[in-house]
């Protein structure tokens, strides 16, 4: 009952915020068919996402202390202090007509290290394979919370039953379906299992981890000693909230564990090039010169 009251209070807040949205910045019409959404503090890595050509618009919900920070980077901008998915829930219910104009939406932590070229490729892969939810694989230079999300060198993508909450990319209608059910009292722990449970029917070949696109999730040791999410709720609070949500919605997929069903192999030339890039500099130069000689011979 308390959770239902919390959700009702949350919805009332939406109505108020819709009437007083002076902090909003938005473009009149989308420039692209894809959207990246993030809830950003004052130490985000957002500039790295947009330095270069891109096939996506950017929505920033700022929860930091420096008023107007990142506003010039955003296509859509609002101010609200909460977690990533509660802030997304708020935005989705206040401005649903904006989200519905997009084909796909990447919901990303603000500290993820990734280039616009890689984000572009994620959206292209989603469309090519008609995926419902996907994520970039995690580079081992950063934090890896689930072994299944660690990049594998010889596959382009792996069909799985799991995508982590850190940076999931949704087909728009699938995100909308989850937003109808989601309760913003759940800040972090278990959100991924919940949105996967919503899509549990016929989701084979629709959920994937993309090894061809990697990102770095910075280690906690590189931050100021405390995770932003811990400022909202302690780990114990998040775990207890997740247990209550699981019971209320009969969510059982977490107990079944994470699985890979199938994979798409990386093309052989890409595998070979990646191997070359890991060789010593002198041997690399020899092989590249050999390639140039072969190409010159074939073109002559």
Predicted regions and their residues:
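Short, hinge-like loop/turn segments at secondary-structure boundaries
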Residues: 77, 150-154, 226-228
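Short beta-alpha junction loops
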Residues: 64-66, 137-142, 213-214
């Amino acid at each position: 009952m308390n959770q239902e009251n919390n959700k009702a209070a949350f919805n009332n807040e939406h109505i108020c915020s819709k009437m007083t949205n002076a902090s909003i910045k938005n473009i009149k019409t989308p420039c692209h068919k894809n959207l990246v959404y993030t809830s950003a503090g004052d130490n985000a890595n957002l500039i790295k996402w947009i330095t270069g050509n891109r096939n996506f618009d950017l929505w920033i919900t700022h929860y930091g202390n420096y008023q107007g920070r990142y506003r010039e980077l955003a296509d859509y901008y609002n101010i609200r202090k909460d977690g990533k998915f509660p802030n997304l829930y708020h935005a989705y219910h206040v401005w649903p007509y904006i989200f519905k104009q997009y084909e796909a939406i990447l919901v990303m932590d603000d500290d993820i290290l990734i280039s616009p070229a890689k984000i572009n490729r994620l959206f292209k892969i989603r469309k090519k394979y008609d995926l419902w939810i996907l994520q970039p694989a995690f580079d081992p230079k950063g934090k890896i919370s689930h072994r299944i999300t660690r990049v594998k060198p010889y596959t382009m993508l792996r069909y799985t039953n799991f995508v982590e909450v850190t940076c999931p990319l949704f087909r728009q209608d699938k995100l909308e379906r989850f937003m109808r059910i989601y309760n913003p009292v759940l800040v972090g722990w278990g959100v991924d299992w919940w949105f996967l449970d919503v899509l549990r029917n016929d989701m084979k070949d629709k959920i994937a981890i993309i090894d061809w696109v990697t990102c770095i999730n910075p280690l906690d040791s590189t931050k100021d000693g405390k995770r932003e999410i811990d400022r909202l709720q302690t780990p114990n609070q998040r775990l207890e909230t997740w247990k209550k949500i699981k019971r209320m919605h009969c969510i059982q997929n977490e107990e079944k564990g994470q699985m890979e069903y199938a994979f798409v192999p990386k093309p052989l030339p890409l595998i070979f090039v990646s191997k070359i890039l890991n060789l010593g500099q002198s041997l690399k130069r020899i092989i590249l010169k050999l390639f140039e000689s072969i190409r010159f011979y074939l073109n002559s």
